Amino acid sequence: MPEKLPEIVRNQPEDKPYLVTGRRIYVIGAQDGGFPQRGEHMPHEMWGIWLPPIKLFNGFWLWLEDDWIGKADRFVMEPFGCRFVYERKEIELERFQWAAHTRGAMALELTVRNLTQAPVQKSLALVIESNLMPVWLSERMGRKDGKDSVSCDLEKGLAAWKDQENPWSAVMICDQPLDAFELLEESRTGSGQRPCGSAGKACDRQGYKNENTSCCKVSFSARLAAGESKRFSFFFGGSVCSRQEAGEQAGALMENRQELLEEKRERYLELGGRASLSFAGEPVLEQMYRWNQFINDWIQCEIPGVGEGVVAGYAEFPWWFGNDTNYILPALLMQGEVAICKETLRLLRRASLKVNGNGRVIHEMSNNGVVFYEGMTTETPQFADCVWQIYCFEGDESFLEEMYDFCREGMRWIESVSEEGLPRGYGISEVAGLDCMCCDVAILAVRGYEVMSKMAKALGREADASCFEEKFCATWEIFHREFFIPETGFYGDMVAGREEIIKRAESWKHSLKSFPITPEDEIVGEASCKQDKSPRESKEKERLCRRMENVIRLAKETEPKSRRAYQLFGLGHSTIAVEFGYVTGKQARELLAAQEQWREKECFQIDGIMPLALGRRMQAYGYSREPEKILQVLRQTGEGFGAVMPGATSEIYPDRGCFVQGWNSFATMWPYFSVIFGVRPRAGQKELILQPCICPDMGKISLTGVMIAGRPFSFFLDFEEGRGRIRVEIPSAQWRVNLVWEEEQDGKPELVVEVCDAKA
């Protein structure tokens, strides 16, 4: 276990976001100390303080001597909270924010330090703007935002807010009496400007104004002797049920502050000791990996009445996705977070059964339990893949048994939307019209049949195992036959008939709109999910038009009722066959090289590069045996580390999309285990299969405390005179470790296995 937790300091911080979370509550504000109103799914509303499925506050702003304190001079990001430092005349103020791990409450602790050798007295205040409102898609539930009311008890140091149309409530408790309370309704709405923009400045919302909020100021005084420091603590609690419960949440945090804060620190110290990385000469990659260990905890959310699970990201996606889960779980499993992985899948299954009832897995569900879209075709086999991964790490058949029937029904649904063995429908790219027989949809169905055959075999269901094995082999052959384009040397984006592709390509020449998921377009915020993904630059738009004209020309050359594979946008889905190990070695290298050459010549970027795509590329390089490229892509991923928020990588490289994205661990953590060491855990058989992809440039790498079957395993790589050596520490002699090394490969590493009976 590491001796202390890391921190990242930003001097003269900007209004870029930060995140502070617990399982029940989270805070998104600006690193300069303010709370700008930003968001897409709910315009202007995705930042602030949230207690899903409701928002509590737009934010709070510190005042000093009847004026806004201004921007922070320093911002410090810690795994369990964050600090803002304000250096002002005679005093220094440190603002520390953290959220309780499991309670619906957070703390704002203000330490005032007298920097002089004489007594000082300062007047301080906190401006607080409530915004008790429901989360995205609440309109479908009939929930409407009401006007907030606020009251204050100065002696008790307490302020309370309630939505007048709903039981939603919030309470703030200060650990000492307050001097004064003032409503700021007039200054908030009268001039069109508010004392609550970034770092306390008046804020222009470009015409946006929520009339249901309530803005107030609570004042207090700091009397300090020479060199003295004094702490003022404010505890915020919320509830979807009552003011009483909100007060109880805040009060419990105040009463147990030291214990709960220490508990949170210890939790993150312990997290840092599980599946920890050491990579000689690569401090950025080490740091990025370590912070992603903490992010894996930040994305865990529990909502009474809905469920618990890992959410996709902040600020735009603090809820659940079928697709994202498939890429988030692997790194969590490395850290031993099996329970939350299972709960996430149970949550998705419950929602899917309620909405679909046929094994189809949902795509997206808001944290109020409302499902936005019933599911991409890819997400059903991905769910089965998740179940199988958990079994591989845990080895317990009970969860496999629990999920088996649902997964089997899901693959039956896949068959119901299939044509000649392969399914039609939307995949991960979300471009309107990309719904014929798509590459990612088809190959993930192949993967679904493969994992179902393995599941059935593990459970002793031999007939099912044989049936799914036959379908796996048959669909792989169909996929290769239908999608492989000899002229390019790799698999196409989509297989379609002549008329299908012509009408789509005519539309794609002009725009790449996200597909119309639901007819309920009138719901506020849903339009943001239908953005045009067309290239922004005119030259790229011209390339798109020329590409589609070529597609139309090819289509017109085919027979009217025949179909063929088309390379459309260079989506990169061709690599999935390599990622799963269906194409390996020399053949994989040739396929990846051909795809890269085509992209350089023909392709345009319809969106920014995602770290997820880089992670998937590393999986492919593992099977194509190109370790130098793995190292290159790892370093490329590291270039986006901290571009927006210290400690995090963004959804889209380097600084776009969600500033904290759960599935980025597929690029920042998972490749060390699954690609470099190439570990394939088989916990049920107490066996590890190693299929490493290494090169001398990697130097020394260690991955210690990886949790498999509830016990720690450690992996060490080094090189001596160019030859690799892999040492594996196993917790018991009952485990077997087998090294797989293809004959065509040079430089087979030495494998050393040691029993190290350390307790988890």
Residue locations for each model-derived region?
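Substrate-binding groove/exosite segments of carbohydrate-active enzymes
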Residues: 207-215, 266-392, 397-400, 427, ...
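A glycine-rich phosphate-binding loop feature that marks nucleotide/adenosyl-phosphate handling sites
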Residues: 471, 495-497, 652-654, 687-695
